[in-house]
């Protein structure tokens, strides 16, 4: 199950919004963990927490978006109790203006979401809200490839949804054979982390799919999953947040995470 939570936060006076403040928020979250939970999360290959900051909806405000997977579910009660959040990078505490918890999301709910993908769609648009990157042979990849995107989603699914893993390597290869990046609008963007700058990218890519029906169903499942899991590295620290919408010519049909 996935627990999707959003907190509207009021920034201290004269404090500017920065996406990398999400790293400090994750630090505040870790500070409240029990030693047992902290050890459990750090032992995971992929941290079962994905979070990022989104600006607005009003000046001086931002929205903290979190997705908690089963191993981190107990954090929901901690987050719900917060009224202020102290961050070392801010001159005063952030005020919690609103807390919203959405209905838990199961595998079956993701399958149903994938089945609502519009048949008239010609592609899927990935909008990278926060800097995204991949680690390849010890270096950061400054541009996404189809293989890197699919491998990231595949690995995250298997780590975060262990009761319904994708074990067929041939299926991954077949999926990749029918996908291609058909358009992109990206720019370089660093993410500040522990005094370092992680090179990445933001913007959008459009991915077209020509797949047999079973593979198309799998692709749509991964599209439904991606906004909750994130893509690339350090998604628990605020990187790799993505929104996905169908590309439908001469139409404004919306298919977004709720």
Which residue ranges define each predicted feature?
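RNA-interacting cores
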Residues: 1-258
